[in-house]
């Protein structure tokens, strides 16, 4: 089964023509570009033979610098040197200001509330900054490959939401790149390892970078490559290891940094010690007038709580995937922080097997993306590889009573399209509001709103007679579109979801955990809401019936009795006793059964008035 054997419009070519395509790892700290050459995925180095391009842009008064040259300006001109822009992309200004208040930049809001960074070259959006980095990578690729690129595959974190993914695509288009696909970083890494070496079975991708941690559980079988579950922690990475060493040095020397420069110096020394401890049993840190020696055992003790935290996240991901650790056949290590021996040792013990480390963990994501780019651009028409990513949080719709009906459950493989039919609640209803939600809870107030739109032009009908088909579609890049259509008239409305800011993987994990912690309460709240909705429906129906036929078909005592039972249900509906509401509904149903029978007989008599048997048999 081949994956998306496509040709872009205008790109049809002879079968033997080789198109130039690359995979790009657009990282928070560093970025890389790779391509398949002579059947092998390789990193494309810059003019100085450097593989890593710092994800930094400096906007000077007279010139713009990208990469290492820009990074060297960070301490000299911090306000005009943009670092870690990946953390800002797809977020609102208030979100950026609350999360990253320590950043040296001056921000203003764009017309749509997104952050603009004030630089010597004017306001720059995170999309523009990312575009400049991508332009640099594009230049490196075209110089190395000797021609114009036909397409690129860009990797993104597994938890990037619609806004962050769309912003990444916008940045690529601004850089003049044809985006073949966005690919989850763990998926790319597993592709570089698993598919390239013929692996089959369950694969775990343990991705520990400088600032974040991601875990993905994947299944590879007969060419189908499926992400079963993902998890992560935005506050866990190699930078945290550096800070732990720095704090240890302060504790040993009793000296605290007095300036920002001293703090940067100490963190740099801590980072160097961490790197030394990768291959040596101890490292010496000389700071101020002191020299202290830290052993690998001491370092392991410092980072133990963080490594344990990552393994707890792994355990949750395995549970989501309904997989036991013993079933995992291979563990792929991604990210520079996985070079730490203690990390490899603990991950190996957790999964019961030695992790795969033969590919440079800094490069594995870009190498996997290059393999996928080579397939999508049409150079490997005989490929049987199929990649399936997943929806990290359930997608649903608001129904009566403030309830959430899940349309696409979390961890559903994408691309995916799911449809469900809904109906009107009131007689003569000609419009329906569609509220799109994200999350695992049962009530609207506990989930995240993604957007709203209104379907108008529904033919006036009795309540429940109209059929509205609502379709949720998530494409291969994780972007969501929702369409609502009234089936008899084909009138429809739709929305493409592009939230103004994104969710971090920490927030996604918190939302999932919240759904587990509140499962019982949520179920009770849902049952109560459903009873209230049913009560509203019954009350509405009885009121309409009384207004239409009550005076004609009921005696005064009967009318008052139904009104009394109706009032009792209206009162009990305001409470929180779902059993009492159910009893009230049953009581009203009993009280109105004779009335309903009389209405039915009256309707039949009216329909038959003036007709003989032959009219009925031969209408």
UniProtKB/Swiss-Prot annotation:
Keywords: ATP-binding, Chaperone, Nucleotide-binding. GO terms for biological process: iron-sulfur cluster assembly. It comes from the Bacteria. Signal peptide: none annotated. GO terms for molecular function: ATP binding; ATP hydrolysis activity; ATP-dependent protein folding chaperone; unfolded protein binding. PROSITE patterns: HSP70_1, HSP70_2, HSP70_3. Belongs to the heat shock protein 70 family. PANTHER family: HEAT SHOCK PROTEIN 70KDA. Chaperone involved in the maturation of iron-sulfur cluster-containing proteins. Has a low intrinsic ATPase activity which is markedly stimulated by HscB. NCBIfam families: HscA (TIGR01991), PRK05183.1 (NF003520). HAMAP family: HscA (MF_00679). This is Chaperone protein HscA homolog. It comes from Haemophilus influenzae (strain 86-028NP). The gene is hscA.
């Amino acid at each position: 089964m081949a994956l998306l054997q496509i040709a872009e419009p205008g790109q049809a070519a002879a079968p033997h023509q080789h198109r130039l395509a690359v995979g790009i790892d657009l990282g928070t700290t560093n970025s890389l570009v790779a391509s398949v050459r002579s059947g092998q995925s390789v990193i494309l180095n810059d003019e100085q033979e450097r593989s890593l391009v710092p994800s930094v842009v400096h906007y000077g008064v007279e010139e713009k610098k990208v990469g290492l040259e820009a990074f060297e300006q960070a301490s000299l001109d911090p306000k005009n040197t943009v670092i870690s822009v990946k953390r800002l992309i797809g977020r609102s200004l208030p979100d950026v200001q609350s999360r990253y208040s320590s950043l040296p930049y001056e921000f203003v809001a764009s017309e749509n509330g997104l952050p603009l960074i004030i630089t010597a070259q004017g306001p720059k959006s995170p999309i523009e900054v990312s575009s400049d980095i991508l332009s640099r990578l594009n230049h490196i690729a075209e110089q190395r490959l000797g021609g114009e690129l036909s397409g690129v595959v860009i990797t993104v974190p597994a938890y990037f939401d619609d806004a962050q993914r769309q912003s990444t695509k916008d940045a690529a288009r601004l850089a003049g790149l044809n985006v073949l696909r966005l690919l989850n970083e763990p998926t790319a890494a597993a592709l570089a390892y698993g598919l390239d070496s013929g692996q089959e079975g369950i694969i775990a991708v343990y991705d520990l970078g400088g600032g974040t941690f991601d875990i993905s559980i994947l299944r590879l079988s007969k060419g189908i490559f499926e992400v079963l579950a993902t998890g992560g922690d935005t506050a866990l990475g190699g930078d945290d290891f550096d800070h732990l060493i720095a704090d240890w040095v302060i504790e040993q020397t009793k000296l605290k940094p007095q300036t920002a420069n001293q703090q940067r110096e100490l963190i740099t020394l801590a980072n160097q010690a961490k790197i030394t401890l990768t291959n040596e049993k101890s490292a010496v840190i000389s700071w101020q007038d002191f020299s202290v020696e830290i052993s690998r055992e001491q370092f392991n003790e410092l980072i133990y709580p963080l490594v344990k935290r990552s393994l707890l996240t792994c355990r949750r991901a395995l549970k989501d995937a309904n997989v036991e650790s013993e079933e995992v056949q291979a563990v792929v290590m991604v990210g520079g922080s996985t070079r730490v021996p203690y990390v490899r040792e603990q991950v190996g013990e957790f999964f019961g097997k030695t992790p795969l480390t033969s590919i440079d963990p800094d490069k594995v994501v870009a190498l996997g993306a290059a393999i996928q780019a080579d397939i999508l651009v049409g150079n490997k028409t005989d490929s049987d590889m199929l990649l399936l990513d997943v929806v990290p949080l359930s997608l649903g719709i608001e129904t009566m009573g403030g309830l959430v009906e899940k349309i696409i459950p979390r961890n559903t493989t994408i691309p995916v399209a799911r449809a469900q039919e809904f109906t009107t609640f009131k007689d003569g209803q000609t419009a329906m509001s569609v509220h799109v939600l994200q999350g695992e809870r049962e009530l609207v107030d506990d989930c995240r709103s993604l957007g709203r739109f209104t379907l108008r032009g529904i033919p006036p009908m009795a309540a429940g007679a109209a059929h509205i088909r609502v379709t949720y579609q998530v494409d291969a890049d994780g972007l969501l579109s929702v369409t609502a259509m009234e089936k008899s008239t084909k009138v429809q409305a739709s929305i493409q979801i592009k939230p103004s800011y994104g969710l971090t993987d920490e927030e996604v994990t918190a939302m999932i955990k919240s759904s587990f912690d509140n499962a019982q309460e949520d179920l009770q709240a849902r049952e109560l809401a459903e009873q209230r909705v049913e009560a509203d429906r019954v009350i509405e129906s009885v009121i309409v019936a009384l207004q239409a036929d009550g005076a004609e078909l009921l005696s005064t005592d009967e009318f008052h009795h139904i009104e009394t039972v109706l009032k009792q249900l209206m009162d009990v509906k305001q409470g929180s006793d779902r059993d009492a509401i159910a009893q009230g509904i049953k009581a009203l149903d009993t009280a109105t059964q004779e009335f309903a029978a009389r209405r039915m007989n009256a309707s039949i008599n009216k329909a038959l008035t003036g007709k003989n048997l032959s009219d009925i048999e031969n209408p």
